[in-house]
Amino acid sequence: MIDLAPLVRRLAGTPLAEWANGLQAQLDTKMSKGHGDLQRWQSALDALPALQPEKVDLTDSFTLETECDGETRTVLRKALLGLSPWRKGPFNVFGVHIDTEWRSDWKWSRVSPHLDLKGKRVLDVGCGNGYYQWRMLGAGADSVIGVDPNWLFFCQFQAMQRYLPDLPAWHLPFALEDLPANLEGFDTVFSMGVLYHRKSPIDHLLALKDCLVKGGELVMETLVIPGDVHQVLVPEDRYAQMRNVWFLPSVPALELWMRRAGFTDVRCVDVSHTTVEEQRSTEWMRFQSLGDYLDPNDHSKTVEGLPAPMRAVIVGRKP
């Protein structure tokens, strides 16, 4: 059982205290329904060797270090491979380098210089395996709660939390819709790589705003296209082989959406083309990746002939 008592204590006396008090029951109900692969992933977690990090770096990377012999490292590597595929990372765990599909550290290096997370209560929506949560703590956040309904990501987070049990990061296997309306308790809310999967992007922005305290900041990272305020791409069917992609706005259009949703001080802090160096297949993620989704003769287009992935980071404030 995952014990959320430390989270309840952490949020006592905050606007999130009432919500926190009901989380254990909500989590237990969700876990009782389970997932077909959950037992296999739990076996991988149970196989993790008991190690105590002597050095932890979450500021410049995710790196745990301690004295570890080759045999123990082999056991560790096998257990972590049992939680494949690993999408977000990389993680350096006692000499085992988890070379994930995404170089998420590159994205974090583009996002983090524009933020001040010191002392902030943070919510990461669609947090994946929690890689960014750990980096947010490294940037000084007071506490970080991630929500993502994917059970494998939940287990990957648990693997890292085994070695960092006292740090104020929690992963809840919930969707944003599972959170109560008008939480209004987080200083900073992240939504990275989620908006284009939403059929109603404005509703998503409004739901994120509901999670923020007054004066709180939204960090929105999503796929965009070139163009003016009137340009929005709605794929006919798939985009980069993904079926569940709905709206890819231009940066000016996304800024307008955020203003219409009630955010102020809206500004774009980064626009980057995704490269096959940043997203690729590895030993830890053996399935197809970005290189398979681009036109082999023209990497400026997807296999469907649409503009290749370009991602923007927009920040805005709740008045």
Curated annotation (Swiss-Prot):
Keywords on this record? Answer: Transferase, tRNA processing
- Which catalysed reactions does the entry list for this protein? carboxy-S-adenosyl-L-methionine + 5-hydroxyuridine(34) in tRNA = 5-carboxymethoxyuridine(34) in tRNA + S-adenosyl-L-homocysteine + H(+)
List the cysteine pairs that form cystine. Answer: none
Which biological process annotations from GO are given for this protein?
A: tRNA wobble uridine modification
Instruction: List the SUPFAM superfamilies.
Output: S-adenosyl-L-methionine-dependent methyltransferases
Q: Which Gene3D superfamilies match?
A: Vaccinia Virus protein VP39
Q: Which residues bind carboxy-S-adenosyl-L-methionine?
A: 88, 102, 107, 126, 176-177, 192, 196, 311
* InterPro entries noted in UniProt: CmoB, Mo5U34_MeTrfas-like, SAM-dependent_MTases_sf
Q: Name the EC number(s).
A: 2.5.1.-
Q: Name one GO molecular function term.
A: transferase activity, transferring alkyl or aryl (other than methyl) groups
Q: Record's family?
A: Belongs to the class I-like SAM-binding methyltransferase superfamily. CmoB family.
Summarize the subunit comment: Homotetramer.
Q: Which NCBIfam families match?
A: PRK15068.1, tRNA 5-methoxyuridine(34)/uridine 5-oxyacetic acid(34) synthase CmoB
What job does the chain carry out?
Catalyzes carboxymethyl transfer from carboxy-S-adenosyl-L-methionine (Cx-SAM) to 5-hydroxyuridine (ho5U) to form 5-carboxymethoxyuridine (cmo5U) at position 34 in tRNAs.
What name is this protein filed under?
tRNA U34 carboxymethyltransferase
Q: Which organism is it from?
A: Pseudomonas syringae pv. tomato (strain ATCC BAA-871 / DC3000)
The organism that produces this protein has a lineage beginning with: Bacteria, Pseudomonadati, Pseudomonadota, Gammaproteobacteria, Pseudomonadales
